[in-house]
Amino acid sequence: MTREKMWTTRREAMALLSGAVAGVAFGGDVRAQGTPKRGGILRISAPTNPSSLDPATGGAGSDHAFLFTMYDTLTEWDFETLKPKPGLAESWSFSDPTTFVLNIRPGVTFHDGTPLDAEAVKFNLERNKSDPKSNIKADLATMASASVTGPMQVTLKLNALDAALPGILSDRAGMMVSPTALKASAAGNVARTPVGAGAYTFVSWADGEKIVIKRNEKYWKPNRPYPDGIEFAIIPELTTGVRSVTAGQNDLIYQLPPRQKVVVERSKDLKVFNGPTLYVFQIFLNWAKPPFDDIRVRKAFNMAIDRESFVKAALAGLAEPAYMNLPKSHWAYDKSVAALTPYDPAQARKLLAEANFKEGTTIDLVGYPDQDSVQRQEILIEQLRKAGISVRFLNAPIAEASAAFFGAEKRGSGLLAAWTGRPDPSLTYSLMFTKDAYYNGGRGAVPPELEAAIKESRASEDVQIRTKAFATVQRLVMENAFVAPLAFQFELVAMNKKVQGYRPNLLGKPKYDDVWLES
């Protein structure tokens, strides 16, 4: 099967989801009106402080909103289908099943003037794969070696065919960092001083307050970007963020909770986009330590959650209940897996009794302190209580909470957060459900057949073969109750009417490729 045929089939299989994103389900005008103009500062209300501005070392999906502005990727994803398309690599091919060739776009430089050539790409890929600080090793698990086979060509030898690789390189693993900047850093990373090859260059970061970037005047895409710069105001309380946009202090706010939809639609000066995404609220579980080291407790925990009620109470009905990590309209979704996690508090109590889990025992979960997160926590606390499960939330800002749960501290037994989706579903599963994956919070053991199925999902370009493999992956994840998925939230973005050219996307991660400001 050719690559084009594979993606045609995928588009058909994703018709409902991508069709909605193409315009039907989104409020507002998806395409820009008028002739784009250069100039102005785009002011954005951002709900989170980044965990890191180094794509290899960050640990929060919310980082992408910042990373995509400063780092270009080897491939890019199509906004409507997530099909990979040329980026810093102007073309790629599998010369044989285990040889992947990247042809790098000539004439591109990093922000510090370092050439973005084959040597730079090789350096980045090897760092992402092998550096102890890298949190994205699993992305490049199939890469055995990288070699320079021409001034602008890199050849990867793979330990198995990896059909997902073009899509993987449109995410963190494909974000290119200046080797010069990395080698000059005593810490071995650019977490606070990012140097990429993206549309904007870094200016400053006042932690928890503001991030400022300016136009890259040597950017390789003609006439891009349009704004002179972007200022991100870090405003965790979304009610405050909305007020900043309605008052004109900021121009755009993203990742709005559904309860804000009525508020922003009421403003005559704002336009609103909303539609489905792969963004899923979930509770990450540490199954390497009590009580979730017992599969019966994990299953009981899942059965104690009424997802339909959660969507109505926490998300104003603007979401899809989640019974696995893919929504119903995704091409790899397997409806039989949804039946593995019914709402059944009586059966949950029975499983807890079998596990000798004493009612009243408190499970510590990590969470976030903002108003909407706390509301979600309160709903879950009450639902779990009905099944005899008591939970306590240890709240901290997103970057701190994520590092505490996934990092060395291993704080809490679970983390109420979100998985922001990936261009290829194999990334979602390999990053959470393989033994050494960063988002496997306790680095807990997984069944060999699960790791084998994840590998199989990447071993063919035939979408039917991949779909069958993903059915096995989804079944094994939920049979083992390694995660407690809750709901797929719709993207909700509000902006001043002077903001033109914004395009929503399936990942729900904002990109500003075509954004310009009316004067």
Task: Locate predicted features.
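Alpha-helical secondary-structure segments
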Residues: 117-124, 151-155, 198-199, 226-229, ...
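N-terminal lobe/hinge region of extracytoplasmic solute-binding protein
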Residues: 45-96, 126, 193-196
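Periplasmic binding protein-like
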Residues: 44, 113, 383-433, 469
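Surface-exposed binding/hinge segments that line
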Residues: 93, 138-182, 204
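Ligand-site clamp/hinge motif
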Residues: 217-263, 390
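Extracytoplasmic/peripheral linker and loop segments enriched in polar/acidic and small residues
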Residues: 372, 392-402, 428-497, 519
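Structural transition elements
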Residues: 320-354, 372-375
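Gly/Pro-rich hinge or "lid" segments in bacterial periplasmic/extracellular proteins
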Residues: 78-83, 171-225, 229, 346, ...
